[in-house]
């Protein structure tokens, strides 16, 4: 009984550890949504700011040699700072995580990213993957190891 109590008391801390150990997988879930222009709510990523439309206004080449046609949805990969700056944080209540990026910059760049209300976070499908394919198996191993 004491062993079970110890395991129960350590579950939230272990979930936090699991999240941080799998930060790159969680970030990949979010960035893959963005690459498909899908927000956490399942809707298309659209910039709600009147200053920015979220589409390339002219044909342009990227820093990496890629090409964007006028009218294409913005793909967030031009400089790479946005995706490189992604991180995951477990909130103080230990029951929720937050995904964000330090690569949103300041000034116009920050205003541009603020126009996307649904960019950070996981779709229902990716939340399922996080909970049942990433966290649960590791949590089950932890519990099995602790109670023998």
Region locations from a protein language model:
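Short, Lys/Arg-rich flexible segments
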Residues: 1-148
């Amino acid at each position: 009984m004491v062993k079970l109590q110890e395991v129960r008391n350590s579950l939230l801390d272990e979930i936090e550890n699991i999240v941080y150990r799998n930060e790159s997988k969680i970030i990949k879930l979010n960035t893959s949504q963005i690459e498909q222009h899908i927000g956490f709510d399942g809707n298309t990523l659209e910039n709600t700011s009147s200053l920015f439309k979220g589409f390339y206004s002219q044909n342009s080449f990227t820093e990496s040699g890629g090409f964007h046609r006028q009218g294409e949805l913005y793909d967030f990969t031009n400089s790479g700072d946005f995706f490189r700056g992604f991180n995951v944080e477990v909130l103080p209540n230990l029951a929720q995580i937050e995904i964000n990026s330090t690569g949103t910059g300041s000034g116009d760049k920050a205003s541009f990213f603020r126009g996307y209300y649904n960019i950070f976070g996981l779709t229902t499908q990716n939340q399922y993957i996080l909970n049942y394919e990433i966290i649960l198996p590791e949590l089950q191993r932890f519990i099995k190891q602790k109670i023998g």
